[in-house]
């Protein structure tokens, strides 16, 4: 095929024809320059262009149409003149109509021209849409990326400069025609027009120069390429700068249009169409703009006006001049005259008779520079860790997260004033509405949200929160509650869940933005101390102090040292804020959170009051207990324990690696780093983490002549810390000379060696000081953020009870329940005298009714966790008692007793369908990688942690032996109906499912190991799907229970209330255990007596009755299992090679025809099984 017949050539030719037919300058006119004249087929040509965009660029993942349109300059030569001419005609017609709504009399063929204007705007949105390269991008898109970016910069300049950006007025006029309509009269097409106008404004803001490189390694410097090479001809940075955009928006009334949409979002507009585009407009409008540059204190505005505010180019020149001045000082300091260069060569002979030579007089002044020059001359250099850029693998612009970049967007004073006024008006009128709408959209449409939208939402959230906090400090009339939606429960849950999910999926760009948003949220909560009675603030604070949250926040700085400097700074800021807030509520300043249900003021509390509330006033027992008890919940923060979770070696690496780049840090960041190091080194005496050679060299480099400037305030802090640090180091080297070698290597994690390094003596452990095992830790449930505390407690108890029953320790669960019931009786009796004696009950000890070879209170992880949930103080040492404090909430005790009793009688159903132990962290997960959220139980700084088993009780090879302890059920070659045997490690004894059995865990030695019998365990947990031995399917009671369930579901419109559901579970278990008989009273379940099974109609399903086919099917199965002759007759009628039993899980209309059960109501995928047709 010749070049003239290639598809691309044909495409360009057709685009050229369309460009010609749209219109052009009218050279017959006497006006100079000639006016634009649209063609006769202008509207059809514009529609054809839109079809080409959809057909080629959208469907084929190419940018050929966009490139051809750019080459023929359709936007600048056709679309802009058409829209501006339409705007001028509309303005003139409006002026001539003198306020009348109908201007068609002064504008002929207005509807036709309106359609042309709308199509022009649609094409402009397509042509200015942000270009993003992803892993799915085609070769064509990659090749055209840089050229199209330059063309979009040309579009941006033309839009902003042609007649002072009048095309923006035309776009807003199109939107105003829709706004004039009543909300109920608007069609979805009208709402899409509003969304399109917002997208057009968003596109103008988002167009920026392209990246220097588009490879995965974006941090590679491109030699010979600068920012000018990414700009097209005749376009400068000032033409497309943010200040130019803001000035154009001010002239063309874009800001009032945005305020109109934002302030009336929930009343006058369909918010689902405009919330995301409006958020993106606000994000790009404030991107890379410092909040401080927009705020002026009283008296500073006049000073700022007198100063010469430079443009962006001027500010960049000023920065370059400062760098040049610093370089000159270094050159003068290290340069000498030519006469002093003689005798300035140094030569060192090595052991292998080789020589290392350096020359230069500066090497005589500084030994470190001489050694550095020798290292630089080596051919092979050490492996350098690669610094990860968060946006590399997520197809995001590299400048998306430059929140800490010094050279941000510079705005002249007048432009700053324009933007400042608009931002203030937006916060006061629209911010809460917009944030609430976008948050609800993200919660409901979570699966549809892409990473870029998540980042935009989080950065939008962080920027406006920080701005309003600073604004309230400057302007006393500003109200911090104008951003009250930021502390709502839904917003906090969304920000927290984005942080958690992005950390788990290693989406580091979202993690970075989530840390920024969470940090600003905490600062906002901290600034709202005077509103501590606010329930939203109480909710945020109560959830902040959960163990899962602290684990996540302490893990973030551990992985930050391998990321960009901006990521490291954000992690340090977040850690600083978290520790500041936690310390505020530690010690005597306990956090008091009011419960959801207010406490009633009563003069005296007695058993009669409790019975009156339950029997006479109809309160539930839980509600009565909460009314009788104080309505406040006190959260006591163990700040020392929480703080220790941040004291990890990798966290120290983060702070030291960040401090190594002190020339790029601001004073505030250096102060945060020194504050953390002081907290760790001085206040907590964790010296061993700092005795390292690189840290000593870092302090020396910072205090050198070319280190921190002598005028810097941070130099004083560094100097004071260095003096104290060196004095402690000298003392440690004298008392423990082994540290002369120790500073060259990382500290050891071994408990014995680490203890000796830290204290200089061997660790002696007495029998009475042996620690008990660590309680089981939970893996968060699905959507745990949305659950209440009572629901989480109930599910955690269900997990532990079910796991203990599976392990054969049901007797221990019953023992816990007996103790809890005894406590309830003690507390109830105490209520009788509470009115006269306000003393709290005495502490009650846990009672073991029988002797155990090994105390389960010390060595059963699940029992210890269960006792901890109930409220017991579990023993840490062997000599410690286990008791229940009298000050603990009585309502929690009652709830725990009910949950334990419930799950002893009803099996616990896990949300994920796996065994309940899947929600418990295994022992081998305690010391997993840094990416996990678990506490580091054997960290080098925490040798006295009571949760750690002493080293004299653990074999040195236990770490390697633990690798073989996982017992996975083998799926292949499984015998039907017989469970495969679980493999046991040599140190781990078997667990027989007997009530009196309890074995010593592998952390304890010296006990005889009992042999494991080779038994074949018959368990339905491991039976493969087969109907040959499926007794449940053959049991008629099973089908009858199904009939009752469907009858109840139909009665309650497909959803049973929670109390009915629990009652039905007891009803089902009782019928299965009693072969269909019912002994208990289930009147509340059926709102009357239990209907007999025969009383239910036998015909097919109707909307008012359950399906009776299951009853017929159960009777058929009984006959098949009991009568061989009838089975033979059935086999003669049914072809066993083609007969299938199809049961639809959700079907309501089921009929039997020729041995088949087929669904007629639902379209779900059926579960098909072969029906047994042969006699037993």
Swiss-Prot record:
This is Topoisomerase 1-associated factor 1. The gene is TOF1. The keyword Nucleus applies. Transmembrane segments: none annotated. It is found in: Nucleus. Component of the fork protection complex (FPC) consisting of TOF1 and CSM3. One of its GO terms (cellular component) is cytosol. The keyword Transferase does not apply. Residues 915-931 have a biased composition (Polar residues). Keywords: Cell cycle, DNA damage, DNA repair, DNA replication inhibitor, Meiosis, Nucleus. Residues 983-997 have a biased composition (Basic residues). It comes from the Eukaryota. It comes from Candida glabrata (strain ATCC 2001 / BCRC 20586 / JCM 3761 / NBRC 0622 / NRRL Y-65 / CBS 138) (Yeast). GO terms for biological process: DNA repair; DNA replication checkpoint signaling; maintenance of DNA repeat elements; meiotic cell cycle; mitotic sister chromatid cohesion; replication fork arrest; replication fork processing.
């Amino acid at each position: 095929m010749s070049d003239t017949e290639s598809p691309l050539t044909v495409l360009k030719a057709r685009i050229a024809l369309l460009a010609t037919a749209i219109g052009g300058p009218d050279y017959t006119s006497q006006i100079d320059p000639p006016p634009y004249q649209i063609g006769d087929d202008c509207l059809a040509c514009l529609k054809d262009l839109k079809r080409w965009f959809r057909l080629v660029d959208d469907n084929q993942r190419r940018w050929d149409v966009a490139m051809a349109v750019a080459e023929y300059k359709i936007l600048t030569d056709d679309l802009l003149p058409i829209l501006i001419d339409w705007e001028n005609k509309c303005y003139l017609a409006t002026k001539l109509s003198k306020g009348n709504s109908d201007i068609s009399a002064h504008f002929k063929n207005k509807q036709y021209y309106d359609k042309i204007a709308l199509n022009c705007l649609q094409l402009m949105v397509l042509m200015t849409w942000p270009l993003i390269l992803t892993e799915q991008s085609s070769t064509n898109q990659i090749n055209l990326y840089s050229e199209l970016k330059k063309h979009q910069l040309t579009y941006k300049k033309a839009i902003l400069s042609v007649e002072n950006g009048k095309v923006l007025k035309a776009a807003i006029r199109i939107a105003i025609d829709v706004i004039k309509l009543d909300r109920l009269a608007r069609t979805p097409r009208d709402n899409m027009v509003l969304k399109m106008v917002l997208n057009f404004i968003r596109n103008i803001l988002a167009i920026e120069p392209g990246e220097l490189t588009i490879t995965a390694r974006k941090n590679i410097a491109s030699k010979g390429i600068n920012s000018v090479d990414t700009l097209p001809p005749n376009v400068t940075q000032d033409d497309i700068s943010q200040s130019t955009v803001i000035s154009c928006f001010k002239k063309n009334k874009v800001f009032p249009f945005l305020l109109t949409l934002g302030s009336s979002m929930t009343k006058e507009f369909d918010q689902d169409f405009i919330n995301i585009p409006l958020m993106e407009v606000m994000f790009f409008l404030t991107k890379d703009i410092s909040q401080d540059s927009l705020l002026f204190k009283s008296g500073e505005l006049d000073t700022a006006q007198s100063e010469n505010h430079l443009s962006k180019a001027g500010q960049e020149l000023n920065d370059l001049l400062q760098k040049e001045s610093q370089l000159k000082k270094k050159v003068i300091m290290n340069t000498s005259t030519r006469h002093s260069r003689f005798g300035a060569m140094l030569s060192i002979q090595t052991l292998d008779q080789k020589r290392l030579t350096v020359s230069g007089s500066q090497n005589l002044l500084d030994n470190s520079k001489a050694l550095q020059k020798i290292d630089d001359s080596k051919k092979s250099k050490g492996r350098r860790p690669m610094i990860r850029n968060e946006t590399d693998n997520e197809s995001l612009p590299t400048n998306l997260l430059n929140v800490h970049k010094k050279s941000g967007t510079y705005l002249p004073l007048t432009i700053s004033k324009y933007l400042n006024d608009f931002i203030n008006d937006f916060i006061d009128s629209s911010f809460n509405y917009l944030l609430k709408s976008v948050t609800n959209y993200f919660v409901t449409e979570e699966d549809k949200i892409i990473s870029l939208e998540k980042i935009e939402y989080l950065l939008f959230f962080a920027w406006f929160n920080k701005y309003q906090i600073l604004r309230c400090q400057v302007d006393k009339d500003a109200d911090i509650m104008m951003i009250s939606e930021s502390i709502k429960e839904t917003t906090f849950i969304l920000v927290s869940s984005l942080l958690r999910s992005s950390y788990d999926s290693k989406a580091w760009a979202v993690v970075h933005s989530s840390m920024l948003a969470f940090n600003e949220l905490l600062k906002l909560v901290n600034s709202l101390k005077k509103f501590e009675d606010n329930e939203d603030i109480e909710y945020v604070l109560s959830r902040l102090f959960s163990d899962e949250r602290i684990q996540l926040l302490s893990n973030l700085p551990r992985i930050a040292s391998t990321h960009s400097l901006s990521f490291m700074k954000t992690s340090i800021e977040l850690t600083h804020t978290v520790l500041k807030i936690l310390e505020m509520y530690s010690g005597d300043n306990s956090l008091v959170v009011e419960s959801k249900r207010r406490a009633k003021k009563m003069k005296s509390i007695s058993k009669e009051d409790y019975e009156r509330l339950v029997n006479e006033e109809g309160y539930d027992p839980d509600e009565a207990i909460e009314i009788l008890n104080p309505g406040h919940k006190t959260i006591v923060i163990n700040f020392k324990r929480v703080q220790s979770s941040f004291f990890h070696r990798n966290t120290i690496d983060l702070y030291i690696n960040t401090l190594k780049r002190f020339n790029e840090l601001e004073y505030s960041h250096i102060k945060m780093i020194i504050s953390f190091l002081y907290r760790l080194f001085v206040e907590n005496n964790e010296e061993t983490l700092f005795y390292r050679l690189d840290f000593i060299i870092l302090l020396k480099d910072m205090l050198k002549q070319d280190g921190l400037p002598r005028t810097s305030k941070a130099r004083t802090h560094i100097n004071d810390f260095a003096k104290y640090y060196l004095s402690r180091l000298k003392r440690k080297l004298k008392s423990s000379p082994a540290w002369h070698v120790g500073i060259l290597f990382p500290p050891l994690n071994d408990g014995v060696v680490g203890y000796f390094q830290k204290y200089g003596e061997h660790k002696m452990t007495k029998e009475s000081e042996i620690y008990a095992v660590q309680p089981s830790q939970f893996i968060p449930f699905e959507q745990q953020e949305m659950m209440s505390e009572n629901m989480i407690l109930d599910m955690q108890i269900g997990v532990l009870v079910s796991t203990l029953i599976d392990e054969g320790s049901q007797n221990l669960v019953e023992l816990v329940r007996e103790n809890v019931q005894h406590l309830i009786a003690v507390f109830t009796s105490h209520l009788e005298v509470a009115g006269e004696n306000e003393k709290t009950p005495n502490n009650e000890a846990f009672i073991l009714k029988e002797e155990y070879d090994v105390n389960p209170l010390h060595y059963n992880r699940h029992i210890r966790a269960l006792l901890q949930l109930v409220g017991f103080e579990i023993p840490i040492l062997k000599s410690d008692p286990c008791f229940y404090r009298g000050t603990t909430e009585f309502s929690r005790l009652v709830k725990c007793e009910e949950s334990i009793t419930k799950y002893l009688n009803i099996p616990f159903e896990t949300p994920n369908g796996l065994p309940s132990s899947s929600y418990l962290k295994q022992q081998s997960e305690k010391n997993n990688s840094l990416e996990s959220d678990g506490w580091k139980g054997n960290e080098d700084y925490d040798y006295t942690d009571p949760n750690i088993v002493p080293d004299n009780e653990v074999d040195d090879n236990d770490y390697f032996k633990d690798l073989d302890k996982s017992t996975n059920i083998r799926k292949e070659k499984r015998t039907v109906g017989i469970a495969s045997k679980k493999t046991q490690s040599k140190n781990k004894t078997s667990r027989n499912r007997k009530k009196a059995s309890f074995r010593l865990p592998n952390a304890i030695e010296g006990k005889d190991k009992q042999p494991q019998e080779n038994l074949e365990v018959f368990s339905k947990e491991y039976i493969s799907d087969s109907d040959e031995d499926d007794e449940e399917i053959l049991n008629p009671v099973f089908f009858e229970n199904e009939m009752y369930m469907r009858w109840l579901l139909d009665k309650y419109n497909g959803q049973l209330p929670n109390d009915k559901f629990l009652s039905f579970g007891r009803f089902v278990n009782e019928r299965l255990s009693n072969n269909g008989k019912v002994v208990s009273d289930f009147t509340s379940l059926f709102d009357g007596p239990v209907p007999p099974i025969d009383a239910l109609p036998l015909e097919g399903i109707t909307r008012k009755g359950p399906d009776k086919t299951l009853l017929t099917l159960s009777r058929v199965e009984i006959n098949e299992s009991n009568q061989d002759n009838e089975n033979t007759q059935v086999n003669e009628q049914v072809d066993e090679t083609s007969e299938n039993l199809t049961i639809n899980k959700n079907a309501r209309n089921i009929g039997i025809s020729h041995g088949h059960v087929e669904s007629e109501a639902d379209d779900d995928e059926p579960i098909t099984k072969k029906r047994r047709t042969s006699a037993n």
